[in-house]
Each structure stands twice: as structure tokens, then as C-alpha cells.
UniProtKB/Swiss-Prot annotation:
SUPFAM superfamilies cross-referenced by the UniProt entry: P-loop containing nucleoside triphosphate hydrolases, RecA protein, C-terminal domain
Annotated region described as Disordered, given as residue ranges: 348-387
Source organism of the structure: Lactococcus lactis subsp. cremoris (strain MG1363)
Similarity field: Belongs to the RecA family.
Protein name (record): Protein RecA
InterPro entries with a match to the protein in the record: AAA+_ATPase, DNA_recomb/repair_RecA, DNA_recomb/repair_RecA_CS, P-loop_NTPase, RecA-like_C, RecA-like_N, RecA_ATP-bd, RecA_C_sf
UniProt superkingdom: Bacteria
Organismal lineage: Bacteria, Bacillati, Bacillota, Bacilli, Lactobacillales
One annotated GO molecular function: ATP binding
Amino acid sequence: MATKKKTNFDDITKKYGAERDKALADALALIEKDFGKGSLMRLGEAANQKVSVVSSGSLALDIALGAGGYPKGRIVEIYGPESSGKTTVALHAVAAVQKEGGIAAFIDAENALDPEYAKALGVNIDELLLSQPDYGEQGLQIAEKLITSGAVDLVVIDSVAALVPKAEIDGEIGDSSVGLQARMMSQAMRKLAGHINKTKTTAIFINQLREKVGVMFGSPETTPGGRALKFYASVRLDVRGSTKIEEGSGDNKTQIGKITKIKVVKNKVAPPFKVALVDIMFGEGISSTGELLNIAVEEGIIKKSGAWFAYNDEKIGQGAEKAKNYLKEHQDVFDEIDHKVRAAHGLLDDSEVAETEEETTASKTKAKAKKEEKAVETEEIELELED
């Protein structure tokens, strides 16, 4: 049996010039031989310099994320209080992946997924891979097998808090289980992170909030499952419902949704701390017309004067709800404004930008012609009245 040649550390010295270049080339060749091609490369040679993304399913959130969506091959954590819209945000990502022809899996550790609600959000429930594991290790092992297959584009785990270790389930209520879940999650993160990166799978972990006891200063809020997920996540989103969306007046007022604030508290692929405000409507999910209207007004694409909203000098509604209904009924106008907003935030490629510019020019020409036509009609009416 051949013995492995030992390194003589006495011979290790700093190299310079041609000797250094040869030493580096030899080291690279040895690393490639021992660990495989691509195990070490110059950053400029890397094929994945630009982070590729999958859409979050929300325009406002895509903009807040900076890169245009959730990064592929990375871990994302979505956390917040109960009923804040965490699962809704994740399901919109599932729908967006399926819309692009991708495969998504949902590991429902909480056993609380509503198929009808998922369907209303645009999820193809016939194609969605669903698992309801008996214990935490089983759920994470299923996730690992899906990720290492390289066939799945998105895996959602709902939720970390519900991934209960088998030892805790097999034990009695009241038995001490300190640190079991944290150790399980720490081991899972160490194993999954590399596989997720290699297969370019996006893994979304939904998490709940807990409160630390005896905290005098700072926020007492924390997330279960230990610290591993916080460290391994490239993106962390804090989801909180803020303002009620109501219809009717007086005693007849009914809540039909809520304005939800999504804060990007950690982002390794773009500047963090951006905020997305989305309208989550009950039974419908994130309102695409609502978020588009808000962003377009901010960008000056849609003009707001008092309660009136106007696009290309044409009024589209008095009040936000009427303007949203107009955009729902006029898909061509919705698509045109959507393109302009995406172009303004750099979410389009070069060909789409050129297409948007052409559409904008055509739209302006059409609006100008319509305005001139109206002016001619007015002039003719005035002449008739004079006669």
C-alpha cells in the first residue's frame, strides 16, 4: 500500500515572480485533482457572478429585495407574528415559480395548508409537491432529498417552529428538551446549505416569533430553532400587518384586507432594510393592482390629484378602489404600467427595456392623437353653437 507523501513544512517559504506563478499553478492543479473541477476558481471566471433570482410573486417585494426576487441557490427566512401573512407571501412565490414552468414543494409541518386558498393565490395545487411530516427530522430529510435531486426549483418549509424533533415527540409532555430543535436545525443548515447552492434551489423557511423572558432593553422578540438559520439565510423578511383595509361606512364598515409591511432585515445580495407595503386581501392574497397603483404613483407614472388618479392625462378612477378596478378591467393598461415600473427599477433585461420604450412612445402618440381628436370635436361643437 502506497504511503501518502508528507509535507515538509521546513521547505514552505514565500514565493516571488515566476516561481510564485508556478507554485500557484501546481497548487490549483493539485486541488482540482483532489477535489474536482470548479472547486477553486478565480472569481471573474465564475459562471454565477450575477445572482439569478425567482420572483417573489409581488412587484413591491421584488423591488425591495433589490435583485428582483429571491436569490437562487440561497436560503430565505420569512418570520413575523401570527396571521401576519407569512404563508401568503411564500405561496405567492410558489405560484410565481409554477407560472415560469418550475417545480415547487411545500413541507407543511404545521398541517395547516388550505388548498382552496392556495388555489385562489394562483398556485397549481395539482402540480404542487406536498409533504406533512410526522416529526422535524423527517421533514428536513424530505427537503434534503428534494434539493439534492436537482429537479425542484423552490422548497417551502412551514414552519421551523413546527419542526419538532423525534425525541421530543417520543417523550412525555413535561420532559426537558432544551436545545434539541436548535441542534437539529444547526445540523440541517450545515448539510443543506451546500446542496442548495449547487442545485440552485431556493429554500424558504417560514418562522414564528417568541419572546425572551426578562429582557429590559432592546426587542424581546426572537425566532425559534436556534441561531443557525439566521446565519445561513441570505435573505430575512420581517412580515407584519399594519393597517386595516375596509369597505363601506359607519356601522356597515367591513374589513376586506390589510396593508402589510414586509421589511428586508437581512440581504446578502443587495442593500438591506428596504420595505415593501402590500395590500393582502382576504381570500385573494397580495393585490397586484393595489401594489402597482401605489408604486406607479410614487414613480410619477400615474398622477394623483386629490382623490383622482390619471394615466397619460386620462382619468382612471376617483379613489384607490376605483382606480384598482380600472386596472383589473384593462389588462393592456396594467401591463404597460407594470413594464414602466419594472424598467424604472432595473428589473427588465435590455430587450424588454427597448420594447418598453417603444410601447411608451406609441402610448404617448395615441394619447396625443386622442387629445387632438377631442379638441377638434369641441371646436366643431362650438362652431355649431355659433351658427
